Amino acid sequence: MDISPFASPLYLLAKPAGARCNLACKYCYYLEKGKLYADRPTEVMSEEMLERFVREYIGAQTMPEVLFTWHGGEALMRPLSFYKRAVELQQKYAGGRRIDNCIQTNGTLLTDEWCRFFKEQGWLVGVSIDGPQEFHDEYRRNKGGRPSWAQVMRGIDLLNRHGVEWNALAVVNDFNGDYPLDFYHFFKEIGCHYLQFTPVVERGQHHADGRTLASPTEAGEGGVLDFSVSPEQWGRFLCAIFDEWVREDVGTYFVQLFDATLANWVGQQPGICTLAPTCGHAGAIEWNGDVYVCDHFVFPEYKLGNIMTDSIVGMMHSERQHAFGQAKRTALPGQCRG
């Protein structure tokens, strides 16, 4: 069996609009990343950079399938023409490989035109929605402080009307974490069969550039932030949903964490880095070509390089990236290891 690093797909999550977003969710870990580029706060990925990324990314793959993931910030802050150009470039450089695309959105900017494109091109759409209105609107508001749930539901309705494949990404926090079954039943009621639950846990740390979240190398100031879900909450949340899911919904509704745990249990790859013994195969690329070790580690000390001067293969298979991935096995307490 080939266990070399090149036996696994090489993966970069792309941020074509950087940290730009039309919402200002209180718990967002990425919104403040724009301060890393404070001298160019309104910049987005240029067409030149897009072509460089598509060409280099496809060329770096050793597998017959290539997955592009478009993320944010809010990925729809780039116009539809940008993604149409991305598809043209993917076709130009595919070299016989199959190209798949998925895109993560808060759902508020979806239109008929966007949905027609996603349907025609076979894109998978991930929608960020934190359950029923009273849960979602607690933290997911726009920059003027207005709630966003109604706009998200309008976007989901458009996806359904156009027959676009979509799944939900829901953040579990201190507020909604106490209502697991209300949360779960909501997604069943709106016909969402693929769910990803993400616990939010952030620590505060003030930086000279205005950022307020601690990086993994920093101790943090005053413990976790108030919107964070507690360990006990998260455990009760998962157990309550699992007890219903395992009795009624296996094979009908797919909860990423449960499926990944089952895969681990039977000796298969879990498919998500949090349950794997090591990580490091999934980096992130910012609008200007900067590459970081991981989407959740976009901090200056975790920058690997830039695709205008460094190869994707060289960065993602570097000793530094390997050490980052192995640290999950060597540096974490035993209880936290995959």
Predicted segment positions?
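Conserved alpha-helical substructure of the radical SAM core
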Residues: 1-116, 121
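Radical SAM enzyme [4Fe-4S]-AdoMet core and its adjacent flexible, acidic
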Residues: 140-150, 157, 161-274, 278, ...
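Membrane-interface junctions of multi-pass transporters
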Residues: 270, 298-338
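Short, acidic, Ser/Thr-enriched surface-loop or helix-capping motifs
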Residues: 286
